[in-house]
Amino acid sequence: NHTSGLPTTPNGNFRTEYTDDELLGIIYKLDLNFDAGSRWRFSYCNYIVLGFLIKRITGEYYADFVTERLFRPLGMQTAQPIDDMAIIPNRAAGYDIREGKPRNAQWISATANSTADGSLYLSALDYAAWGADLLGRKAVKAESWAAISQPARLASGRIYPYGFGWFQG
């Protein structure tokens, strides 16, 4: 819940391919921004580490894990990890503003698209399926929703209104 102290990004080059061990090694060598549990600060590194934990515990990469446990049970037909090389009909691509003009977003490495910090394609219908499940709460166990809905408690006792991936309130 972003109380680890890990920096926001791993400071790597997102256009360079890394092995899992190389990327984890980059994160391992980073200095913490603060002592774990003392503050809250959003960090993509937390999600990258989460992806490695999912792989270590389940033997599955994040995208495979969420496909089997979330996308398929909810009937999300197009949800998939980002693959810049795949031909996806009607795909909406990202844009950057450079020199005041919109341009196609620059390619980033497949490594950056394989971690648990996002990097998914979903259609509007898939988002609707996800939203409907949020209301009905069928695909995610009740105890998981209970954990998700708990705000972060810092070592000082202060509460920060963010659960596991969700702002509270």
Please place each PLM-identified region on the residue numbering.
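Short, surface-exposed loop or secondary-structure junction motifs
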Residues: 1-169
